[in-house]
Each structure stands twice: as C-alpha cells, then as structure tokens.
Amino acid sequence: MDMSLLSFHSEGKIEAGLDEAGRGCMAGPVVAAAVILPPNYKHSLLNDSKKLTIKQRELLRQDIIRDALDYHVAEVSHTVIDQINILNATMKAMHKAVKGLKKQQPNLLLIDGNRFKQYTGIEHVCIVQGDGLYLSIAAASVLAKTHRDSLMERLAKEHPEYGWDVNAGYATEKHRLAMETHGLTPYHRTSFHFKPKQLDLF
C-alpha cells in the first residue's frame, strides 16, 4: 500500500500548505508557515514527518527551504495572543504567512485543521490532520515547528527553570511545577487556561 503524501489537492492550482506550531503552549508565540512546493515534489522524510528525530527534522527544514518555490514563516507574540485570544492569533499568524509569500501567488490554500478565516478572496480548504495527507502542509508543519523550537531554545537560556528547550512551552509537568515555584516570566501567556478546550480549538 502506497503511504506517500499527496502532492496536490486540485490539479492546476498553485497551492500553499499552511500549518501552525505553539497553539496549545503556555509561553511564547504562535508560529505559522506557508509553503508552495514544486509540482509533483517528493521527499522520503516528508512521508513520515510524525516520526522524525530532531536531527532529521532540521535536515528536512533545510531541504524544504532549498526546494520550495516560495515559503514564509510568521509569528504572533504572546502579548497579542493575550489581547485577541489564541484562535484569532493563530488565524493572524496564518494570514501573515500567506502575505509573506512574494515569489508565488497561491490560488488555493490547504489549511491543517478545521477552521480558517478567509484571506483576501483566495480559495481555501480545511483538512483535519492535513499534515499527514499533503506534502505542502507537512512541509509547513516542519518549518513552523523548527522555527518555534529554535526560538524557545533561545528563550530557555534566559529562563532555564521552565525547560523550554525540551517542552517548547507546552504544559508539561516540569513546566507547570516551575510556574508554581518561580511564577510567570515575561514570555508566558496570561490568557492560558488549563482546560482541554485550549488544546482542541481546531
């Protein structure tokens, strides 16, 4: 059985895959990436992106940046998240990622998840678990995650108690205990609530 991811959703369209990283985190920004891949693009690692090691993901990031027809990674800060809520902040990050595409203008956006706010009249399709179905979304997932992980590793040097170099700001036990012991840093989201809904907005 062929488990390869799909190269396109609608033949003849210029498709940009979109995904985010950090939606369910207690600290740091939400990051979104938009990627336009060449037609019929294939990459062996991208077919198994959920099982990648950190080293493989970094190598894949370099290949995507080299091979993509266009890509852009965008951040929305924790302060903006607190102002407009995480769902709106995620949409804002995705819109910024699409706006940042300069070499190619997509006419179809493939969105990982089941919600998206229309962007400047460009057609879009929401696909639950799309990073496991379409190469462009999987590529966007890799770029968003590696960008955000790198950022959180840098912030971890300022606040090593919270383990952000390992947990990337997610609500792990170590992170929660550090918050109880040391309080909030300037990078924490004050709007975060420890509720399952926070992690299931899509």
From Swiss-Prot:
EC code: 3.1.26.4
GO molecular function terms noted in the UniProt entry: manganese ion binding; RNA binding; RNA-DNA hybrid ribonuclease activity
Cofactor: Mn(2+); Mg(2+)
Assigned keywords, A-Z: Cytoplasm, Endonuclease, Hydrolase, Manganese, Metal-binding, Nuclease
Cofactor binding annotation: Manganese or magnesium. Binds 1 divalent metal ion per monomer in the absence of substrate. May bind a second metal ion after substrate binding.
Keyword Transmembrane helix found: no
Binding site for a divalent metal cation: D19, E20, D112
Catalyzed reaction equations: Endonucleolytic cleavage to 5'-phosphomonoester
The protein's enzyme class: hydrolase
An annotated GO BP: DNA replication, removal of RNA primer
Annotated RNase H type-2 domain residues: 13-202
Pfam families tied to this protein: RNase_HII
GO cellular component labels: cytoplasm; ribonuclease H2 complex
Subcellular locations according to the entry: Cytoplasm
Gene3D superfamilies in UniProt: Ribonuclease H-like superfamily/Ribonuclease H
InterPro entries documented for this protein: RNase_HII (IPR022898), RNase_HII/HIII (IPR001352), RNase_HII/HIII_dom (IPR024567), RNaseH-like_sf (IPR012337), RNaseH_sf (IPR036397)
NCBIfam families for the chain: PRK00015.1-3
Alphabetized HAMAP family for the sequence: RNase_HII_B
Role description: Endonuclease that specifically degrades the RNA of RNA-DNA hybrids.
Family: Belongs to the RNase HII family.
Name of the protein this chain belongs to: Ribonuclease HII
Species annotation: Cytophaga hutchinsonii (strain ATCC 33406 / DSM 1761 / CIP 103989 / NBRC 15051 / NCIMB 9469 / D465)
UniProt lineage: Bacteria, Pseudomonadati, Bacteroidota, Cytophagia, Cytophagales
